[in-house]
UniProtKB/Swiss-Prot annotation:
Organism: Candida albicans
Region (Disordered), start-end ranges: 62-111
Example of a GO cellular component annotation carried by this entry: cytosolic large ribosomal subunit
Protein name (database record): Large ribosomal subunit protein P2B
Gene: RPP2B
Its biological purpose: Plays an important role in the elongation step of protein synthesis.
């Protein structure tokens, strides 16, 4: 992902056909080592392709991926014991607390 981001950054900066050395120089300028094999694989995959078409294709693929969770309406719709509903609410609060504690999900900009 970092190689693709560097490639796109160079293209946006005016370099219409970034080379492996261009991408390596950009990554090293921010302290990231470039793996030559991955970089060559990316350049081979992008060779002869229009970036705008690739971005449009990626957007359609991302749109088809489910990204939201199901609504938690089971506890409010049930007519069971109050203790059962309280236990479910407690579990939801614990899940929310876990989600909030991992905001960056362990990813950096160029990791």
């Amino acid at each position: 992902m970092k190689y693709l981001a560097a490639y796109l950054l160079l293209v946006q900066g005016g370099n219409t056909s970034p080379s492996a050395s261009d991408i390596t120089a950009l990554l090293e300028s921010v302290g990231v080592e470039a793996e030559e094999s991955r970089l060559q694989a990316l350049l081979k995959d992008l060779e002869g392709k229009d970036l705008q078409e690739l971005i449009a294709e990626g957007n359609t693929k991302l749109a088809s991926v489910p990204s939201g969770g199901a609504a938690a309406g089971g506890a409010s719709a049930s007519t069971g014991a109050a203790a059962g509903g309280a236990a479910e609410a407690e579990e939801e609060k614990e899940e929310e607390a876990k989600e909030e504690s991992d905001d960056d999900m362990g990813f950096g900009l160029f990791d």
